[in-house]
Amino acid sequence: MRASALALVLTAALLAGCGSSGSSGTTAKPNGEASKPASRVLADAEAAATNARSAHISGDITSGGTPITVDLTTARGKGGKGSMSTNGLKFDLVRIGDTVYVRGSDAFYKHFAGAAVAQLLHNRWLKGSATHGRLKSLAELTNLRSLFAHISADPGKIVNDGKTTYKGQQVVTLRSVGDDSKLYVAATGKPYPVAIVGNKNGQSGTVTFGDWNKPVSLSAPSDALDISQFGG
């Protein structure tokens, strides 16, 4: 559940606005999560998220002094799209099925491939396998199930601090005793994750979840260079 877990998976992937709660029905009825044990609320939030048809994930995190910005849209069983950056290294990402497309900034390409290659790849898309090879870890950023597996794995001691309001929405607060980060879960309708907020131990910032089950349009970039041609 920790914000650090999310920060670590985002950073690891790179280096290998707050949306609405989405469609949970027209009536916002209490869902009973406020009275459940923290572990049950976490499991319910993970189940709601991973069974959603789509979601939008966005925010800014600082992990160990490293700033990370993420803006991703995922579509279950289809793929996803968005962008991510850290320390000035930005890339755009599209995954459609088993194929992933990546377009890095000049700084991104220079960092990973050198100045000469960066010049050749200026504003160019690369494509490769989403299931193996160099781009697999980036492709996993568009898989909500994979992201939440990292967030919920070995959460340490967490407590249910009960119901509160976060940016106008009724939520249940799960708090990590170890690093004081918080996961806000919708207190009405389906128990979708609303936000993760980090507070200390080198982790700070907020990642929000929203636009649940909204339609997502994905299209493959044209003229993408196949990374397998470069031994990837």
Task: Indicate where each model-derived feature is located.
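Acidic/charged, solvent-exposed loop-and-adjacent secondary-structure segments enriched in E/D, K/R, S/T
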Residues: R103-S146
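A short, amphipathic edge element
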Residues: I151-V159
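N-terminal mature ectodomain segment of secretory-pathway/periplasmic proteins
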Residues: R40-F108
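Primarily hydrophobic membrane-targeting regions of prokaryotic envelope proteins
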Residues: A3, C18-G19, A55-S58, V100, ...
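Gly/Pro-enriched, hydrophobic low-complexity segments
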Residues: D60, G162-L225
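Short, surface-exposed beta-strand-loop junctions and turns on beta-sheet-rich folds
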Residues: G88-L89, F108-K110, P191, N201-G202
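N-terminal leader/targeting segments and the immediate start of mature chains
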Residues: R2-T69, D223-G232
